[in-house]
Design a protein with these regions (language model features):
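Active-site helix of classical SDR
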Residues: 130, 166
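Conserved mid-core segment of classical short-chain dehydrogenase/reductases
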Residues: 84, 91, 100-116, 159
Length: 263
């Protein structure tokens, strides 16, 4: 792990290179020190130029773009190899896994194609890159992985059970990966946010008529929590922190009662 004199990462990889939360986490790291930022997202993504400009404006030492398609798992080894410098190897100090789909909850459980698609991206692709990140960081003997999960995966609800089930799978995988990599000097942080105010979620609320839920946070709040918790070596946090206790209660409500709750 190549850190500067005060422990700041020198190279940060963002899988989901246009993710507003992921970019906010990168920006939070850049407040501490300049770093090389590697953004990986879909070829020709319309948000590419905006993401690169945001990282440059935030003080990145340099910004690199790598084409990354979550569904094309066969291409993932090449993506991760490129992130580690390809023919000129380098360490990646922090890798952020922040790609995913939300989708329309009622459509998802009635549309086989879209249900499979969200499962492939939110879970299968996350496992694919997680294994590869683990291999690389284990070999370098250090590193931090930050995986964006969701409170929706802690206890899957009828209102969004397809999405929630994919996050439950991601959550379990990365918690387990953290245990497996701990002895090799690698730390994995799983973040379980509730609703986060981003362009994507705001558009989703408008399209579906949904309302902002209690405990909704800004992406900057999640970023602050992510950087602080990862630096401290934590393995699991909620955003906001109070959500931990809310979910603790919800997790133990009997199912006949739980299904009647307006959530």
């Amino acid at each position: 792990m190549v850190l500067d004199a005060v422990g700041n990462p020198q190279t940060i990889l963002l899988l989901g290179g246009t993710s507003e939360i992921g970019l906010a986490i990168c920006e939070r790291y850049l407040r501490n020190a300049r770093a090389h930022i590697v953004l990986a997202d879909l070829p020709g993504h319309p948000g590419k130029d905006r993401a690169i400009a945001a990282m440059t404006a935030a003080g990145a030492r340099s910004v690199e773009w790598i084409d990354f398609d979550g569904i094309d798992t066969a291409s993932h080894p090449g993506v991760i190899e490129a992130a580690w410098g390809g023919d000129t190897p380098r360490d990646v100090d922090v890798a952020i896994v922040a790609f995913g789909l939300l989708g329309d909850a009622e459509e998802l459980w009635q549309n086989q194609r879209k249900a499979v698609q969200i499962a492939q991206i939110n879970y299968t692709a996350a496992v694919s890159v997680g294994v590869l990140l683990g291999e690389k960081m284990r070999a370098q003997g250090s590193g931090r992985i930050i995986a964006m999960s969701s409170a929706a995966g802690e206890r899957v609800r009828r209102s969004n059970f397809v999405y929630g089930s994919t996050k439950a799978g991601l959550d379990g995988f990365y918690l387990g990966l953290g245990e497996a990599l701990r002895e090799y000097g690698v730390r994995v942080l799983v973040i379980r946010p509730g609703q986060v105010r981003t362009t994507t979620t705001i558009e989703h609320w408008r399209a579906t008529g949904a309302k902002e839920a209690p405990f909704t946070v800004d992406k900057e709040d999640v970023a602050e929590l992510a950087v602080t918790a990862s630096t401290k070596g934590k393995d699991l946090v909620w955003a906001p922190g109070l959500f931990r206790y809310v979910m603790m209660v919800l997790r133990h409500i009997p199912r006949p009662i739980f299904r009647k709750l307006p959530i």
